[in-house]
Regions:
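Topogenic membrane-insertion module of multi-pass membrane proteins
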Residues: 1-45
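Cytosolic, membrane-interface loops and tails of multi-pass inner-membrane proteins
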Residues: 1-6, 63-87
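Intramembrane alpha-helical segments
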Residues: 2, 78-80, 84-170
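Alpha-helical transmembrane segments of integral membrane proteins
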Residues: 7, 16, 20, 41-45, ...
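Hydrophobic, lipid-facing residues on alpha-helical transmembrane segments of integral membrane proteins
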Residues: 18, 22-27, 48-56, 154-161
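Membrane-embedded alpha-helical segments that form the functional core of polytopic membrane enzymes
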Residues: 26-27, 36-63, 119-132, 172-177
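Alpha-helical membrane-inserting segments
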Residues: 27, 31, 56-60, 106-109, ...
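Early transmembrane hairpin module of multi-pass membrane proteins
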Residues: 53, 57-64, 82, 93-98
Length: 177
């Protein structure tokens, strides 16, 4: 595979994992629709935010697992683009930054459409922080038994709950089920 090629990036963002983000936004939007609050533009921005955050998390994971020695070029399972040398360090860091900025742009749109509820900025920022610190930083959550909790929150409750909230303007217990 050619270094930094489109096929290398497709491998790195792990498209097979993106269905999780899509499904969670669809669930939150379906609940909003059922309750009469569906807002297509908000749903689309939630989808962009969720998918770009998933891509960010996948790229950070690809990079940091290799740097920490968890992934090697000869690992069992799907190839990891950085471990295989398909993406350079500089390109990987740029890709992480680009997907993070795309998520921030979608988040800014959601913030504006929410009427500038600034506490939502904290939620968006926490999504970014946890996407990084799942496998990055001095105390990666995935390596200290906290990965499952982070996944339940940031790839479960938060996407469904906030997709609903941003469309309906309130909470529903159904989003936690």
């Amino acid at each position: 595979m050619k270094t930094n090629s489109l096929s290398a990036w497709i491998l790195a963002i792990r498209p097979y994992s993106l269905g999780n983000s899509v499904i969670l936004i669809l669930i939150g939007s379906a609940l909003a629709f059922t309750d009469g609050g569906f807002r297509p533009v908000v749903a689309l921005l939630c989808l962009v935010f969720a998918v770009t955050m998933q891509c960010t998390a996948n790229l950070v994971n690809d990079l940091c697992d290799f740097l920490k020695g968890a992934d090697r070029p000869d690992r069992l399972g799907p190839d990891r683009a950085f471990a295989k040398g398909y993406i350079t360090l500089r390109a990987m860091k740029s890709g992480i930054a680009a997907f993070t900025l795309a998520a921030c742009a979608a988040g800014a749109g959601l913030l504006a459409l929410s009427g500038w509820n600034w506490w939502l900025l904290l939620v968006g920022a926490s999504c970014i922080v946890f996407a990084y610190f799942y496998t990055a930083g001095p105390w990666p959550l995935a390596y200290h038994g906290m990965g499952d909790i982070a996944v339940i929150l940031f790839f479960g409750l938060i996407p469904v709950g906030f997709t609903y909230y941003l469309q309906c303007g309130g909470w529903s217990g159904e989003t936690a089920v």
